[in-house]
Swiss-Prot record:
It comes from the Eukaryota. InterPro entries: 3-OHacyl-CoA_DH, 3-OHacyl-CoA_DH_CS, 3-OHacyl-CoA_DH_NAD-bd, 3HC_DH_C, 6-PGluconate_DH-like_C_sf, 6PGD_dom2, NAD(P)-bd_dom_sf. Has high L-gulonate 3-dehydrogenase activity. It also exhibits low dehydrogenase activity toward L-3-hydroxybutyrate (HBA) and L-threonate. One of its GO terms (molecular function) is NAD+ binding. It comes from Bos taurus (Bovine). This is Lambda-crystallin homolog. Its main location: cytoplasm. It is found in: Cytoplasm.
């Protein structure tokens, strides 16, 4: 079996042909890997391949296609498959992308466990399901982990690597190297935790944003500006810990200077919101003024978002670290 560090990439199986699965297929193909895109419904695979061709051609025309290969070369590396054993055969890595349902994913990994060899990595794209629940009882558990991407993975490079308690260190190392090879930014979680790292941070922000709107402190539109034109601009380049470090004479100076103030404010934070009722309706109406919730407007806004993310990714790539 080829390894991510070899000169000739091997094969990757992507299980699930939805938006996340298609993004993974594009990423692996951009680095020269042969990709088998599996779905239990053959029509879904056919539709996915048509969608991939359209998107990759558009990316090439706009100059945002990743990798050194042209769109046609990358597309030639992606094939559809509706037989799971055939999809996995010869693969160095399997990336699962089925809907976020524990029983569905457990059933799939039980099938993969029966046909996997002792070398292939079995990876889930789950955003919140714990590896200890996903991979419990599998014979190949040492080869299993979660590799959680950020939506959309083609435009946002972060991938959280979350091991099962029995995952072999080499499995994490190989997956880390593979993610780097396809242009992603992997981070290692040293142990599993509910929500992983990204969603725990995201949910903390969402909860306080909701409370501020619910308590009449700020409007939904202005709340979003606090992030998009404030914190978000910094966080696109440096994280919260480095921000602290730079906003004083180092981290210890920041903690000494602002620690008591932070604790005072944090003690005023309210309980976990219900995310329903009058506040939900208020936020919904405010969002619909900006982006109506019909399919056409939402798709157009997502396309605008993806274009912004791609331009930002290119800018970050050009800037010195």
């Amino acid at each position: 079996m080829a390894s991510p560090g070899s000169s000739a990439p091997g094969g990757v199986a992507v299980v699930g042909s939805g938006l996340i699965g298609r993004s993974w297929a594009m990423l692996f193909a951009s680095a020269g890997f042969r990709v088998k895109l599996f779905d239990i419904e053959p029509r879904q695979v056919t539709d996915a391949l048509v969608s991939l061709r359209k998107e990759m051609k558009m990316l090439e025309l706009s100059g945002y296609l990743k990798g050194e290969l042209g769109a046609e070369e990358q597309l030639s590396l992606i094939s559809g498959c509706s037989d799971l054993r055939e999809a996995v055969e010869g693969a160095l890595h399997v990336q699962e992308c089925v809907p976020e349902n524990l029983e569905l994913k457990r059933k799939l990994f039980a099938q993969l466990d029966k046909i996997a060899d002792d070398h292939v990595i079995l990876s889930s794209s789950s955003s919140c399901l714990l590896p200890s629940k996903l991979f419990a009882g599998l014979a190949h558990v040492k080869q299993c982990l979660v590799a959680h991407p950020v939506n959309p993975p083609y435009y946002v490079p972060l991938v959280e690597l979350v091991p099962h308690p029995e995952t072999a260190p080499a499995t994490v190392d190989r997956t880390y190297a593979l993610m780097r090879r396809v242009g992603q930014s992997p981070v290692r979680l040293l142990r599993e935790i509910d929500g992983f790292a990204l969603n725990r941070l995201q949910y903390a922000v969402i909860a306080e944003a909701w409370r501020l709107v619910e308590e009449g402190v700020v409007s939904p539109g202005d709340l979003d500006l606090v992030m998009s034109d404030g914190l978000g601009l910094r966080y696109a380049f440096i994280g919260p810990l480095e921000t602290m470090h730079l906003n004083a004479e180092g981290m210890l100076s920041y903690c000494d200077r602002y620690g008591e103030g932070m604790k005072r404010v944090l003690k005023t934070f309210g309980p976990v919101p219900e995310f329903s009722g009058a506040t939900a309706e208020k936020v919904h109406q405010a969002m619909c003024v900006k982006v109506p919730d019909d399919a056409e407007h939402l798709a157009a806004r997502r396309a605008w978002r993806d274009g912004c993310l791609m331009r930002l990714a290119q800018l970050k790539h050009q800037l010195p670290q």
